[in-house]
Amino acid sequence: DAMVAKQATPEIPPLLVLDDNGNPVPLVDLQGKFRPELGEFAGKYVKNEYYNDGEAPEKSVDVELAIKLKTENKAFKVEKYVHSYPNCWRTDKPILYYPLDSWFIKVTDVKDRMHELNETINWKPESTGTGRFGNWLKNANDWNLSRSRFWGIPLPIWRTEDGKEEIIIGSVEELKSEMKLAVDAGVMSEDIFAEFEIGNMSEENYDKIDLHKNVVDKITLVSTLGKPMKRESDLIDVWFDSGSMPYAQWHYPFENKQKIDENESYPADFIAEGVDQTRGWFYTLHAIGTMVFDSVAYKNVVSNGLVLDKNGQKMSKRLGNATNPFETLKTYGADATRWYMISNANP
């Protein structure tokens, strides 16, 4: 168990095997199967839940492993142990923690400043700001920015194969400029965004460009030493999109600079979301605002509770246990619904 290993004193190093290229890799591949080096267990999913319906073996692989160790007298004791385990919130299938190279934002460098700025925000209830959110800030870790997915904003980072040279692209204009250098150097045949006009903000012009992964991954840039540079394959955490909303909605800094720089539209006077956003939108807004502008992203915030179903579970579309609020209002009226919510909630 990775968590137990990391918490041990001294820390237990991860178990790795060497792949065909001699690189140390985990025992399990990215599909959740044991690697070929694992002999009789190779190709088996580490969790029965990963199999298609009707394909899972009678004994899961962890049971097979336990039996093998006991049979070969290599285990002191084998017993069942009931414990909590993280599941995917979309599929309800078990999650595997997998060691991958990632890009991080060094939030820990501004952790104290984030806490200072949070004390200037008017939280309702105050306990959420000083307690749940405040404690989250005090224990904030560096932000894992990259995601190994297909849909999302691509990391605008191009690197040489040896990783010694890299470039971070900050605008389409800069990307087109670098593509021209790449074409001139012969590492690209053409500028794939040649028809796009810099400075033309019309929809017609932006129909000529596509910045999604399947397109930008075709772009090869050239380093200062003349080496080809490929884009880092990962995407950006979607919470970074949400946290950038105050500036991105105005196409800042390419347009409407005064709205942000002169505080016409920033920071927000008021925002409201559920208490679960202390680790989501509230946090990403605050983190980016602190790092980019040394400012709060919002002055006042109302953090409401969550509506639970009859079994005490949070209502959600995924679980299908939500009550249509408009049908409730139509049947009982707004005042009766308000009174019901207030009288059945903690003060």
Q: What is each model feature region?
A:
Residues 1-280, 284-347:
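Non-cofactor substrate-recognition interfaces
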